[in-house]
């Protein structure tokens, strides 16, 4: 049976045809413009067509967890009459429901357009759910939504209810009757778009229409959006709203601005009073970032947590000699440098990680000899990552609004009745959110105690004296990075917390917590496999490190009893790319953000840090959040790594050579590392043939192991220097040494088109794939993150996007949905375990899945591959079954009966009901199994040889298996099959 079913000639023809179509479409625009919401909403129609065209829908898809580390919670809503029942929103994992205090959960949002949730609200009396799509935490993976969704049948179906240009929603509050308020933050990465929806919106007709009540024009910044909203439960016309002025770019994040502020309305939003004036005691608003609101209705007391981006006042130096800082060397003369205190210089060099050979004596000498300029010491530290933390800012502060509310129209302190802001604490709240308060904004007040306040950042802190003093209430089993808190109004000791590690519940005010992490909602960045038998799966997660577990994992509670969770934690931080040395399947390369990698071996205990360094006098290296690494499949002592330059090690990372210059467009001023390599791959057919891609849209190829490089960038619609696409994958083919695939992603420009290019001539010419101008076979309007190619079957590709997984039989020319049971979740990484023919799918929100490709790969022929639409019902002869004594008996007291299983490989030509019959030589039906709603495509049909009479199982002998559609439309197929005697 042919495995290389699609000839090179056929594939080349498809690529040329794709190129022609792409050329016609590509001329329409050469800019990376934000994608219109209408195009994003049309993805639903594209998805339906690709689902109907799928020929892999019947393959076995299984979730392999893990669950224990969970994922980022953004909101929850608790049943006021039964606090054991609540609904949870995960940032990219959808909406889940529990009725047993978090012991078990059921998903409610799996079949919508997307899984990205920012806020939710539940009408518990009517069992209605409102979901605001797109979280507001402004992280690197805070995906944009398409507005508000509504379910009136408890999540069975969902209706879109507008605000499609809001992108990110921070709060939903239900009003009386059919009223609803929404705090819409607006796009994360783009400004100056009049169609965007930012601010406080209100609807009185269940979202059929919306009225804008407040936006940033009130503060002179229309780009500011709404991050939080309070509706006074005692006076529903009394509102508090917080606006946030933030701008994110690939290279920079401005966390605050003059548009950030707090507003109050006493007429349902018809008019507003600005409360964030400095004359009311509010910190200077030019540098105010995200805020969160908490209101005690009975006491009429408003608390606010503020991200104060103003520079922290410098502390007085205790020592006679002040500590040196990198910026001190800017503009310093040689004479001034020579006058420095040698001990202070030595401390500076040691504290900032300068190379060992760069001690104070040698640096003094090199500067005196003119070999080194003093500014080189500042340049050595001058990467963008350092700019994220310097200079130090004030950070989190808690304020309380005291005195009476401002009356409508009274907008100055003299008009007010003594109302003003007071900072609740004298000492600063250091180490609450460090330099990234934009990620939190959590504050809550106990409904039964106006002086008990809880705030969240990295730690979870409680105050019982109105915010004057604070103590931690998180325990060792509570994850850091907190986003939501609920305090039971009838039992204040009962608290539910949502964080980056899922849900925690306490019944004693925080002394003890229970982790409620049964949903598989892990946010994976990367996955890998080894070659052990059975093989193991590796994955790196957002804020949850790197883990390894069995490919046959099945979720269950057994580990609670044994204490042996099937997955092992290998590394901490944000887990990034993984490589495994398959010579021993124990030497593993893992890392966390910004290029900090290590090599470890759990059996030998070996562990080494891997991080190529620049030398004093060189321009600092720039490292991407997800730094690419690649272990050569030709020689597994060879490890490749990319900063903005290319690094190679010939000894498993013990020593690195920097072989290239800058392979990006160069650095860009900002506080986020940019101009970095994001993708790296070596040809599986030629040792040393390499490709790299960058975050600013460049692709470079090397034929000689990295010594020389040539730019070979596909003609993606980029507009350098500001609007460039991010290269997410460079992939050399298993089937042609000159074939290279490249994917681009425009997420960081709110540009959501799919870009997949292929070259059959080593990057000399390129063709765009998956964009044939039709809904039927093109990729949907979703950015591409990952691509995988089958080693066994030429032309078989899998593409992971921000909305799911798609498959192609013809090298990427046409596409279909890979599997309907995979949620509409971002797929960040793909890898095929070639020995087992299993596709491992790393999702950013629903953990890891495995798709069994064996029926597809084993069942394909060249004719079938080139014309799958014309295929008829077919089946293979299953392996004979060996009879065993004890079929149907329980293995132990109350265990499940031992049931024999037979796998029948088949191709199902259309969705529907099918039947397998087991017959004797006289065509008497002895056994039968009916399959309801089978998907189209290749699959294994599992059945047990039970007698239709119910009297046990068939005896050893020769039988006929018949397969047919239940309505008879496909005809009937028969094969001979046997149950054989058990050997002695």
Where are the regions that the model predicts?
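Contiguous beta-strand segments within globular domains
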Residues: 885-911, 940
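Bacterial N-terminal signal peptides
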Residues: 8-18
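C-terminal tail/sorting-segment detector
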Residues: 963-984
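A short tyrosine-centered beta-strand micro-motif
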Residues: 914, 939, 957-961
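Beta-propeller blade termini and top-face loops
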Residues: 25-892
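Sec/Tat signal peptide C-region and signal peptidase I cleavage site
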Residues: 20-23
